Design a protein with these regions (language model features):
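Catalytic cores of soluble, metal-dependent hydrolases
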Residues: 5-111
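Short, small-residue-biased leader/transition segments that mark boundaries at the very start
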Residues: 1-2
Length: 111
């Protein structure tokens, strides 16, 4: 059916968020898009409150910039997963997740 395309976090550094957003838009085209964001895509410095923190992840600025660059896609559904309040002592992860949900809501409004 659909082939997945993996974009590694280091590509955000080498290509920049604008080019990554364009790659995603080209790949998706006019198809309906379900976007699932696992919070552990963010570096633990930006999202420590997850069950599986991964070093060398994205920054919050990178994910916000990419989401803003996806305007015009046929976004039909989205979610943010793996936020674990038990590990989120300063609520940094919850704030990052809320910001992502805000940006996703803006995308829905523009779809």
């Amino acid at each position: 059916m659909y082939k997945r395309q993996i974009i590694h976090c280091d590509e955000f550094q080498t290509e920049g968020t604008d080019k990554i957003a364009e790659r995603i838009k080209k790949r998706v085209g006019d198809n309906a898009l379900y976007l699932s964001i696992d919070i552990d895509v963010l570096d633990p410095a930006f999202a420590p409150g997850t069950g599986t923190p991964e070093i060398a992840g994205m920054t919050t600025r990178e994910i916000v910039n990419v989401l803003r660059g996806l305007s015009g896609l046929n976004l039909v559904s989205a979610d943010v997963v793996e936020v674990s309040p038990a590990y989120d002592h300063a609520e940094v992860t919850s704030l990052a997740a809320a910001t992502i949900v805000y940006e996703l809501t803006n995308l829905f409004a523009k779809s």
